[in-house]
Amino acid sequence: HDADVTLKDIIAFVPKLNANPFFNTNRNTNLQIEGHIRGKVNNLKGDDLKVTLADGTYIDGNFSSQNLAVKQEEFLILELRQLNTRVSTLRQLIPDFNPPSNFNKLGRMRFSGSFVGFFVDFVADGQLSTDLGNAAVDMQMRLTDGPERARYAGNLSLSGFDLGGWTGSDDFGLVDFSSEVVDGYGLTGDLASARLTAAIE
């Protein structure tokens, strides 16, 4: 049940995965995998899975997927006990995922929770710990038109979050707040807008 493979090794057995942007872009990425994987490529499931990448990215959890070999129809359900990674790694791994550069300031991210949906249209619910502080998220996000036209809604709470470090402004410091985001649009500073109800503690 343990394996040390590259994605191109998997593609060699399942050529249809060449059509999948994740597999195609990351074909030389080395994975250490432990756990139980079963099913066919377009209906794959994994239990008690632990995956480690060379850059220190670590995933511990369960997953089920559909249509991995069908471009733009890849659907995932992830139940994550732990995801430890950086935004720069997610940019390389997830097709069309390119949030603004200030997301890099989050540094090493540790997430536990769930992810349900497509790479560019999903719901994420869980706890996030970053180099700038902590967050609890329950958000629906649609990135089908890119980060400039992203649409999102849900709940976000920040705890001990360095808003000054995030924005690059000395006018802000550490914040604790809970918010409900409605009709969020855009992830870039010049275009972003949303209706927000927030309680600052």
Regions found by a protein language model. Give the residues of each.
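Extended lipid/amphipathic-ligand handling interfaces
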Residues: 1-3, 21-23, 31-42, 48-51, ...
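Short intrinsically disordered, low-complexity coil segments enriched in acidic
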Residues: 1-18, 79, 89-91, 197-201
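Flexible, solvent-exposed coil segments and beta strand-coil junctions
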Residues: 12-17, 28, 39-43, 90-95, ...
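Structural signature of outer-membrane beta-barrel domains
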Residues: 54, 83-85, 131-133
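Outer-membrane beta-barrel translocator/channel fold
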Residues: 85-91, 164-167
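Short beta-strand/loop motifs in extracellular/secreted proteins, especially
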Residues: 152
